[in-house]
Amino acid sequence: AGLEGSRFGIAMGQRLDLDLELAGEGAWPVLASREGSKERTGLILATPGATIEKIPALGEADAPAFDIDLSQELKLRASDGLPSRAPQRSHMVMLGGSMQPYVWTINGAVWGQHRPVTARRGERIVLSFHNMSMMGHPMHLHGHVFQVVGLNGRAVTGAQRDTVYVPPMSMVDVALDAGEAARWMLHCHHMPHLETGMMTEFAVSA
């Protein structure tokens, strides 16, 4: 189910579907602000002949941190979630790393030294992303859609996603049905973290 409001957070690799209600004629800016910065960009929706005023590239205040307490995620509910089913396999996925040296890991290993997260095709899997670092990580799984089922130990019937944001020192559980037998990438979508090792594979066997 959707949220009503005028401001929504989004992590790297995520998407928003916006249903806008615009009254009458005029011009309406739809802006995106970068976390911790005054910089912003966006677009302007306008009816024919509307006056469009120039908007400064910098906002008045730094944009707030994104969903650091998972309050937005907690409000989200899937309109058509996964069928109810007991998990056949669970994996703890530990997210870690450091600024000095700048290295980011999954289950203590960088890409190339990783151990795959395994499943068999058709199994209901629960992945528990446990972030033990002081940076947030938008975790993305290729080839699958999962449903958020736990936030810091609290069971939820949450959103369906392919990228979920895991704030610092937090845990997010997601459930999915393992798809085609293949090696699917599982990684942080913050590119500097990905480039320094924060990737593993979700290995599905037949």
Placement of each model-derived feature along the sequence:
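Short amphipathic beta-strand starts and helix->beta connectors
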Residues: A1-E4, T157-A159
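Short, conserved phosphate/pyrophosphate- and ester-handling motifs at nucleotide-, phospho-/glycolipid
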Residues: G13, H142, M169
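Beta-strand signatures of extracellular beta-sandwich domains
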Residues: P138-H140
